[in-house]
Amino acid sequence: MISDSLRIRIGDSDAMQPAPGHMPVRQAIRWLSAYDSPSPAEGMRVFMTPSAYVRCCAHAGSDLMHEVGGALVGRWRMDAATRQPYQVIEAVLPARHTRHGPAHLTFTQDSLVALNEDLEDRFPGRLMLGWYHTHPRMGVFLSGQDLWIHEHFFPEPWHVALVIEPVTRAGGFFVRDTAGRLDPHAYTGFHELLRDGRGSLRVWTNLRQEVVVEEGGTG
């Protein structure tokens, strides 16, 4: 574990508020998990750019014997019309100097310092929105140690945790509900942003595409 004296610095969180924005639902495909309702979620909605998704999956697949992980970087917004919070993950920062094994990943002090330096140097003006790590051959869930990391280093209501199972190609986000609770097994899908008319890059086979019924359609 890591000392509480060193936390991932994400800005002045006490005074931080999401900037107004327009949720880009029409520019994205919504992927649902078995725990998701087809109706719009009430809590935080997660959008991910193609480049961030590809790089995250590439890092996850780089070691199928040990857990790897890092930070999710991007913007935190609130839809001006619906007042619903959402985040756009634009990049990932693979963590260096970690201690890892087949069933554990620990961020060291050097890991946290490097993540903060990389955030400031490479992505000024962006936030650390959460973290990701892999569970090779173990499934998509948050272990007791994962929950400890999330609660101590990603305590804000808008922080998310992404777990990827690279062997079976599965993945899912863990998002706190409006009361601040987090279910370590009930993961959610995400909104995959599409760019330049290109199709989906999704490789996680445990998620299904949302079926959108146009207004006035018969379904």
Can you name each region flagged by the protein language model?
Residues M1-M128, R137-G219:
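Conserved beta-strand-loop surface patch within small alpha/beta domains used
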